[in-house]
Amino acid sequence: LLATDALTRLRLRPVARVGCLALFLAAVVAALATGYFDDLSIMREYRVNAATFGREVQRHLWLAFGSLFAAVAVGLPLGLLCHREPRLRAGVLGALNFVQTVPSIALFGLLMAPLAALAVAVPWLGEHGVSGIGAAPAVVALFVYALLPIVANTVVGLSQVSPATVDAATGMGFTAGQRLRQVKLPLALPTILTGIRIVLVQNIGLVTIAALIGGGGLGAFVFQGIGQT
């Protein structure tokens, strides 16, 4: 993070910035490979818990990316619908904004009872891992949190497309579907990708809290360390 921030402040060109960052990462990897950091306590701790660490990293990434993909699959169509229906937009964005005000640990806790009841009512879901604790409430909470940036950025991106551009496409004989696929979405894509990037950063941080409800991830090490102090 420090290296990335420093490169940004230097105002280098994109190619030079990527090259400098690659050199920095190569130096860190070389130092790790040669054992330069082996005497540090964090490296000793890693060697003792290497298998557990690898498993929790995989679970952390699965929770973060799994909820992201689900949010993209739902958020993009919902954003398109909100763009077309202004009255629906106000209600949907208002509800998603309200969800963002709920603390993550509180939302994780609120989902435990409904999901536990759902697993009892529908045994098939319980057999496939849905329960009041574990990954299920974590994925649902992360999914709900992820919807606002994706839906909002989709609406903003589509709204920023120039009406003159859309009119030109109409004059060329484009249908409504063609205007959406070939004109509006490509022009709105940078804004939509910004929303997805925000969600990914947000999810990676929030997954840490999931360890409190048995969701696993790197948060398990965080709370283990807190418990030992």
Residue map of PLM features:
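N-terminal, non-cleaved signal-anchor transmembrane helix
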Residues: 1-62
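Cytoplasmic-entry segments and transmembrane alpha-helices of multi-pass inner-membrane transporters
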Residues: 20, 78-114, 142, 147-159, ...
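Interhelical loop and adjacent transmembrane-helix boundary motif
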Residues: 215-229
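Transmembrane alpha-helix signature in integral membrane proteins
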Residues: 53-81, 196
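Membrane-interfacial helix termini and adjacent extracytoplasmic/periplasmic loops
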Residues: 40, 108-149
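Transmembrane alpha-helices
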Residues: 176-210
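Alpha-helical membrane-interface segments at transmembrane helix boundaries
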Residues: 54-62, 96-100, 189, 193, ...
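Intracellular coupling helices
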Residues: 158-170, 178-182
